[in-house]
A protein has these predicted regions:
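Bacterial Sec-dependent N-terminal signal peptides
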Residues: 1-24
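N-terminal prosegments of processed precursors
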Residues: 20-150, 265-268
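Fold-level signature of zinc-dependent metallopeptidase catalytic domains
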Residues: 21-26, 30-36, 154-301
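Exoplasmic/lumenal beta-rich domain surfaces
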Residues: 243, 442-462
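The catalytic-center signature of Zn2+-dependent metalloproteases
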Residues: 245-267, 305-380, 453
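Proline/serine/threonine-rich low-complexity linkers at boundaries of modular beta-sandwich domains
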Residues: 393-410
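Short, solvent-exposed loop/linker segments at the N-terminal edge
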Residues: 417-425
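Extracellular acidic, Ser/Thr/Pro-rich low-complexity tracts
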Residues: 419, 430-435, 447
């Protein structure tokens, strides 16, 4: 097997100062059997349950500085982890809406927190009329999520993605994977010290809006919660963020009988965004649907391309939570930004089929095939997906580019070796960073499966 070493430089906001602890906002709870759940079909781990003072949290967050205009924060918030402990984070408001939309819906907020107790942890969370939802990324443990589990939005469960059982019917991504028109070149490093911001238009069906209460504000709150998490992964892996356009609420439909969507979601979304928003006014478009579990990006790498950039959709019977956000939405938008499927159970001829079985990263099919190696996708992209997306967006011009000032780290995976099958081995790598940032590493298989390594043999032989 061939391996490449992927070095990940976490985006770090420096010179943050300490403020008082606001841990009293969260209190451990034993209310596990008396809950009135948001949706009885949602099955979440409930070993660690907390009560949240939501109004107190809102008040505590009022002083959080805006991330894009400040490098310092005295706002410190505690967030419970899956071990039942409270972890402190230095918090910035991190709106994923353009200013006009954010001003129209001031109760819908997004934030990012930089770990104090664990400096390698980054929390992405949203606060809205739908409550509190979070995702904490850390290189030394499984991604952790917080979800409301009571209808009054006072009780929350904290869990690791690795501990969650998949209660969904299989998800089908029906996008047709195509090889890149020109060969993908190996780059020295995917990072070029540029943050790329794309204007995002998200539409929804009437059924989706009804699921969250039936108003545009509630639909937007749900979209904001999902995209806060998706943005967290895209920022961490691609240095890409998406911002909902100022008039995004024009394409939020609350009546299933009159919305412009039937079943031809790809073409109907593209037509809707072209006519209602205008091709010059967004960079990538997506549709959220409450229906059967499936999705289709409409194209590969078509962000910024008029006539096709607004043709992706994600559909689920339960269009909320980490499975919807990470396994489904991030997967389909990943296609739109240029990533192909990474599983090896089937060889699609793109050069990306590198992961054993159905895969374990976002562009795989974790948990939904007969060649599964795990139940759900890990909340990150495979090294080849990162290469595909970053190569693609570096050739785009529709986005806004912002220099990060972050020095590009270097990684050394050592010499290449060929060893017999089933031989034990140990991998040793190294890296350097001119800024002195702590680097994290991830070893991944980096050769695409041959025709004899697909199907039932993919998990065992890859």
């Amino acid at each position: 097997m061939k391996y490449k070493l992927l070095s990940v430089a976490l985006l770090v906001v420096a010179n943050l100062s300490f403020a008082q602890n606001k841990s009293a906002i969260w209190n451990a709870s034993t209310k596990k059997t008396t809950l009135i759940a948001l949706d009885e079909n949602i099955q979440l781990p409930s070993e660690k349950v907390f009560e949240l003072n939501l109004s107190g949290l809102r008040s505590a967050l009022n002083s959080a500085p805006k991330r894009m205009s400040s490098s310092q924060s005295q706002n410190i918030i505690s967030i419970p982890n899956a071990d039942g402990n409270l972890e402190q984070f230095k918090v910035f408001e991190n709106s994923i809406m353009e200013a006009e939309l954010a001003a129209k819906y001031p109760e819908i907020k997004s934030y990012v927190g930089i770990g104090i107790d664990n400096p390698l942890s980054i929390a992405y969370f949203s606060v809205s009329p739908l409550g509190f939802k979070s995702m904490v990324l850390s290189p030394n443990k499984s991604t952790e999520f917080i979800e409301p589990i009571s209808a009054d939005l006072t009780t929350y469960t904290v869990y690791k993605k690795a501990d969650k059982k998949n209660a969904f019917t299989p998800f089908e991504c029906s996008v047709i994977d195509k090889a890149a028109a020109s060969p993908t070149m190996m780059l020295r490093n995917a990072d070029d010290s540029v943050l790329r911001t794309f204007r995002l238009a998200v539409s929804c069906t009437g059924e989706y809006a009804t699921y969250f209460g039936g108003t545009k504000a509630q639909a937007l709150a749900a979209i904001n919660a999902s995209m806060t998490r998706v943005n967290g992964v895209f920022e961490n892996d691609f240095a890409i963020r998406m911002v909902l356009i100022a008039n995004n609420d024009l394409v939020l439909y609350t009546n299933a009988s009159t919305d412009p969507y039937t079943t031809s979601y790809n073409s109907q979304l593209q037509s809707t965004l072209t006519s209602v928003i205008g091709e010059a006014n967004y960079d990538v478009g997506h549709l959220f649907v409450r229906a059967s579990n499936n999705g289709n990006a409409g194209c590969i790498g078509c962000v910024c391309v008029n006539g096709s950039k607004g043709s992706g959709f994600t559909s689920s019977t339960i269009p909320t939570g980490d499975t919807f956000d990470i396994d489904y939405v991030a997967h389909e938008i990943g296609h739109q930004f240029g990533a192909n499927h990474t599983f090896s159970m089937s060889n699609e001829g793109t050069g990306a089929n590198m992961e054993p079985g159905s895969g374990s990263t976002i562009m795989g099919y974790a948990g939904i095939t007969s060649q599964d190696v795990q139940t759900n996708s890990d909340a990150y992209f495979h090294a080849f997906s990162i290469q595909q997306v970053t190569n693609n967006v570096k050739a785009k011009t529709c986005q806004t580019n912002t220099p990060t000032g972050n020095a590009v780290p270097t990684a050394n995976a050592g010499l290449d070796y060929t060893i017999p099958k089933s031989t034990p081995f140990m991998l040793t790598g190294s890296g350097t960073d001119a800024d002195g940032d702590v680097l994290t590493y991830n070893w991944e298989q980096f050769n695409s499966a041959s025709s004899t390594q697909t199907g039932a043999s993919s998990a065992a032989s890859a």
